């Protein structure tokens, strides 16, 4: 009988071979390269991988040689575009090397496999083990579910767009995919914010013994996280559309944020989208973590003497959870920084009147796809970070992935009982400590 490790190894090899075949198939189909989207509409230069933070920056096309306006069709119907002035043509084409495409495809497949296995295992651990169903772990489960949505939707679409570029999935999927992508990153960001706040609340009420089960406030937090994430993703579903144009005599269909929005709000959203994504989906979790971890540190220093005497073991567990949450936020910042950096650079450095602007766009397009891979890596690296930082999650992953005969509950039952006894003894000792202080002070 084959071991699980050998079966997983063979499955991984088969997936890598399939990825290589996908790369060759995408090149042989004759679709335009990834940079072709930049010349769409004749009046726009766009990077359009529909990622969690996919963006569109309006400007005049660098690849159009004609001064006549391009004909754009929406949903198969022709729509006239008013004549506009065009900047000088680029001195070179925007291109991505085939080597980068193959490397990107292999990395995406690896991230896809690791992310599916890691986040599914994490959700299974929290679902199967009652002792793991507490407030912080339920928020981590919400984070893992958001990451799983991102992996399933985002990585295959981005890989296909890099290799084939044409959008064959129809207008409905064109609106649904960016909506799900933006909702998933909203779940990730707000879950990290809630975890940071939860760690401060745990330290501020440090004498409270952590129980098993989901607190009502945590359940309310999770509902709010998902509702707010879905609401903030609605403009993506409204703004994205199928855009069809001619590219070197061939029809090219692309799913992108429509440059000609119908309402004033959507026009404002299109203009301010990059800064909105950077501020809310990147800076907000970092700022909240910095504020509440600073407050938590001050609280721990203020109560240091009593905590060391009475609740030493309890304090160690809460410090471990706080360290785990901080590690998750740090990984999030490192993984998402390249993607936001590439788009902020385009906003600040791009000059449509510069004939050398396409060299900058070639560099930013590669940096954009590197950032997309790094953002996807964040979705698969969270379970790995939990494995490395948290002893409890490490034991859970070993028990679940290695299929040990002894279940996690059996291995942890004695530890849980001992921990509860220690907590009760510490509570009793702390009460005596407070009583002695009260009588001595009186």
Swiss-Prot record:
Name of the molecule in the record: Endothelin receptor type B
Gene3D superfamilies registered for this protein in UniProt: Rhodopsin 7-helix transmembrane proteins
GO molecular function: endothelin receptor activity; peptide hormone binding; type 1 angiotensin receptor binding
Keyword Disulfide bond: yes
Membrane topology designation: Multi-pass membrane protein
Positions in the Extracellular compartment: 27-101, 164-175, 244-271, 351-362
Signal peptide: 1-26
Similarity-based family: Belongs to the G-protein coupled receptor 1 family. Endothelin receptor subfamily. EDNRB sub-subfamily.
GO cellular component: nuclear membrane; plasma membrane
Domain of life of the source: Eukaryota
């Amino acid at each position: 009988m084959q071991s699980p490790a050998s079966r997983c190894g063979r499955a991984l090899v088969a997936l890598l071979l399939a990825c290589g075949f996908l790369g060759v198939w995408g090149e042989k189909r004759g679709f335009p390269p990834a940079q072709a989207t930049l010349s769409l509409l004749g009046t726009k230069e766009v990077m359009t991988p529909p990622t969690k933070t996919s963006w569109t920056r309006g400007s005049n096309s660098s690849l159009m040689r004609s001064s006549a306006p391009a004909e754009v069709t929406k949903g198969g119907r022709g729509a006239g575009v008013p004549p506009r002035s065009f900047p000088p043509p680029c001195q070179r084409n925007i291109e991505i090397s085939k080597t980068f495409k193959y490397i990107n495809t292999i990395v995406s497949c690896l991230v896809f496999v690791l992310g599916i296995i890691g986040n599914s295992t994490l959700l299974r651990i929290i679902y199967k083990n009652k002792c793991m169903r507490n407030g912080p772990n339920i928020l981590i489960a919400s984070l893992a579910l958001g990451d799983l949505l991102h992996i399933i939707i985002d990585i295959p679409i981005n890989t296909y767009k890099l290799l084939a570029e044409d959008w064959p999935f129809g207008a409905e999927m064109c609106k649904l995919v960016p909506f799900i992508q933006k909702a998933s990153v909203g779940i990730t960001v707000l879950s990290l914010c809630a975890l940071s706040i939860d760690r401060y609340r745990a330290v501020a009420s440090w004498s409270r013994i952590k129980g098993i089960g989901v607190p009502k406030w945590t359940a309310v937090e999770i509902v709010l996280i998902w509702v707010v994430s879905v609401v903030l993703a609605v403009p993506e579903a409204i703004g994205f559309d199928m855009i069809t144009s001619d590219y070197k005599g061939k029809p090219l269909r692309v799913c992108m944020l429509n440059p000609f929005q119908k309402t004033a709000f959507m026009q404002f959203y299109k203009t301010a989208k990059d800064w909105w994504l950077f501020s809310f989906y990147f800076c907000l979790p970092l700022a909240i973590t910095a504020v509440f971890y600073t407050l938590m540190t001050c609280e721990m220093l203020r109560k240091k003497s009593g905590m060391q005497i009475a609740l030493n073991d309890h304090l160690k567990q809460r410090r471990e959870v706080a360290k785990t949450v901080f590690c998750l936020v740090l990984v999030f910042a490192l993984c998402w920084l390249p993607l936001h950096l590439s788009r902020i650079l385009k906003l600040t450095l791009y000059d449509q009147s510069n004939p050398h602007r396409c060299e900058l766009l070639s560099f930013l397009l590669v940096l954009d796809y590197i950032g997309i891979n790094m953002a996807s890596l964040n979705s698969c690296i969270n379970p790995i970070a939990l494995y490395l930082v948290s002893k409890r999650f490490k034991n859970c992953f070993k028990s679940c992935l290695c299929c040990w005969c002894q279940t996690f509950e059996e291995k942890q039952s004695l530890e849980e009982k001992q921990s509860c006894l220690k907590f009760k003894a510490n509570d009793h000792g702390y009460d005596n400590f407070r009583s002695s202080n009260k009588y001595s002070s009186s």
